């Protein structure tokens, strides 16, 4: 496994690799949202059932539009979302037809976040699209909080590590239903 800068990890992601990187609260694992083989690999590493779905993180709202059905949001709902972004708020949004079940799981919606974390911003800007994101842990275990923990837990399983500082959050992102405004976590 190779430690890489955000600008260097683009090739790993585009070739179907799974990468680890710091987020607002914990280290995350991610991959290309348009590569089902990469998503399957990520789910296998985490030992996570596909039915639970995953989160997409992006550097801006435009990157999410190929995946979410923005037309189902009212202007008021859109303004509520934009008032929280970029930041540690994940919104559940309606999906566009044809989105992989590996992303949305058994739901007809998708969890998405525009992150203000500089590493996520840099990776997504390099890719020109969002990144699948999930906490860096095997299901049922605590998430990794440092690049040393990543190396200890995932050596030989992931393809790259972007070391860096975690954000200021001490808990996972708040999850909000974009349509109803209900806080889910």
From Swiss-Prot:
Sorted UniProt keywords: ATP-binding, Cytoplasm, Nucleotide-binding, Nucleotidyltransferase, Transferase, tRNA processing
EC number: 2.7.7.87
Transferase in keyword set: yes
Protein name: Threonylcarbamoyl-AMP synthase
Domain (YrdC-like) ranges: 3-185
InterPro entries per record: DHBP_synth_RibB-like_a/b_dom, Sua5-like_dom, TC-AMP_synthase, TC-AMP_synthase_SUA5
Role description: Required for the formation of a threonylcarbamoyl group on adenosine at position 37 (t(6)A37) in tRNAs that read codons beginning with adenine. Catalyzes the conversion of L-threonine, HCO(3)(-)/CO(2) and ATP to give threonylcarbamoyl-AMP (TC-AMP) as the acyladenylate intermediate, with the release of diphosphate.
Main location: cytoplasm
Compartment(s) of residence: Cytoplasm
Family, similarity comment: Belongs to the SUA5 family. TsaC subfamily.
GO cellular component terms given for this protein: cytoplasm
Reactions listed under catalytic activity: L-threonine + hydrogencarbonate + ATP = L-threonylcarbamoyladenylate + diphosphate + H2O
Single GO term (MF): ATP binding
Entry-linked Pfam families: Sua5_yciO_yrdC (PF01300)
Spans traversing the lipid bilayer: none
SUPFAM superfamilies cross-referenced by the UniProt entry: YrdC/RibB
GO biological processes: regulation of translational fidelity; tRNA threonylcarbamoyladenosine modification
Keyword ATP-binding appears in the UniProt entry: yes
């Amino acid at each position: 496994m190779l430690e890489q800068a955000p600008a260097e990890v683009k090739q790993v992601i585009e070739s179907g690799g799974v990468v680890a990187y710091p987020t607002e609260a914990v280290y995350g694992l991610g991959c290309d949202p348009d590569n089902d083989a990469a998503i399957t690999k990520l789910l296998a590493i985490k030992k996570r059932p596909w039915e639970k779905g995953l989160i997409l993180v992006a550097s801006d709202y435009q990157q999410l539009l190929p995946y979410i059905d923005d037309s189902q949001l009212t202007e008021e709902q859109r303004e509520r979302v934009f008032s929280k972004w970029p930041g540690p708020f994940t919104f559940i949004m309606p999906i566009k037809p044809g989105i992989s079940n590996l992303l949305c799981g058994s739901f007809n919606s998708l969890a998405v976040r525009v992150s203000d974390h500089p590493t996520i911003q840099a990776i997504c800007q390099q890719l020109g699209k969002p990144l699948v994101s999930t906490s860096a842990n095997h299901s049922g275990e605590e998430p990794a909080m440092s690049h040393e923990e990543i190396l200890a837990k995932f050596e030989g399983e992931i393809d790259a590590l972007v070391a860096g500082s975690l954000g200021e959050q001490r808990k996972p992102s708040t999850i909000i239903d974009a349509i109803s405004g209900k806080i889910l976590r």
